[in-house]
Amino acid sequence: MEGEDGLGSPSLYRFTAEHADLLAAKGCIWDEGYRDTREQPVISLGFKGITFLELRAHGARADLHSKWGAIVPNPAWRLVQALATITSPKGVITIDGFSSHLAPISAEDAEVLKTIELDEAGLKREFRISGWVRSMKGPALVKEHIFGPTCTICGIQTGHTDAGAKTVLPSTAMARLDFRLVPDLTHEIVVNLLREHLDRRGFKDIEIVELGNAPLAKSSAKSIVARAVIESAHEVYGISPLVYPMDPASGPVGAVCGVSAPPTPVASFGISYAGSNPHGPDENIRVDDFLQSIKFIGRIIYQLGAAITETNSVKTAELKLERAAVQSRS
């Protein structure tokens, strides 16, 4: 059990970096997943990375009466103006040079994307929203959801935010942002590009404070662990699972699966459902999903054993053929 996920898992990263030799494996099973609005189990073969940071603007030594607003700089406005340069009104990230660091989608991933269909109407009902960003739909929506980088304002804090009126000119303003990272985009690239982007626009005074990060994890649907999990889902749930090449969420998966060479393949699933509301005040799971997941795990263990036995048998047969060929030549 690792309890620092929300903090960026700093202790886990230190441990895995020091003990990479202990983590080499044929596959990794991760515990992130759910059943969607149509009750299809969702299996992910990786996770986006993440960069979490703060932008801070500073003004007077302390909050002032707002009568000074005509002549004293307001850090809240300063921060808002800086934030407005980071994305377009349509939600496209506009940081200089950002798009040039996004890897093209591989042929294998493009084929997997074709099999995914989001329950757009059901999700909109669940979230109580009227539409998606940039009015996307269909394959474009799926592609953006899984392979699109993000820049999310997670919170803004400045001035007087309690109930009632108070005429305040804030002394500080802070925004917390997270960036979800896709292939070829790293924490270091994002921080450096953001710093340069703000500096070019006259925002050298905006402070960037790095709070945490995690690299992405990415593997193939052809791996032994992926095949075992997908086949087991068919058998246990009686329905074809949705297979995501990469989960839109993030976590310390890269710290575990990315430290060995080659990286360890990962397949992830979970016991939540569309209404679980992870990280919300009413986060929950259903008892039936919990019980069915026990059967799912049992079937995966069986499938992994069968797959590895088959692989070893093939290797043994190939070795016998090689030896026979050598003997015949001699």
Regions inferred by a protein language model and the residue ranges of each:
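Alpha-helical metal-binding/catalytic segments enriched in His/Glu/Asp
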Residues: 1-8, 53-57, 68-89, 177, ...
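A short glycine-threonine-serine/GTX helix/turn-capping micro-motif
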Residues: 64-72, 163-166
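An extended, acidic, His-containing surface patch that forms the Zn2+-binding/catalytic region
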Residues: 37-38, 93-172, 180-193, 201, ...
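Short coil/turn connectors at secondary-structure junctions
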Residues: 22-26, 49-52, 262-265
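Alpha-helix capping and helix-loop boundary segments enriched in small/acidic/polar residues
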Residues: 3-7, 42-43, 70-71, 220, ...
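Flexible glycine/proline-rich, aromatic-decorated loop/lid segments
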Residues: 42-58, 266-273
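Acidic, glycine-rich active-site loops and adjacent beta-strand->loop/helix elements
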Residues: 1-8, 31-35, 59-61, 247-249, ...
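Acidic/histidine-rich catalytic neighborhood of metal-dependent amide-processing enzymes
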Residues: 1-46, 309, 323
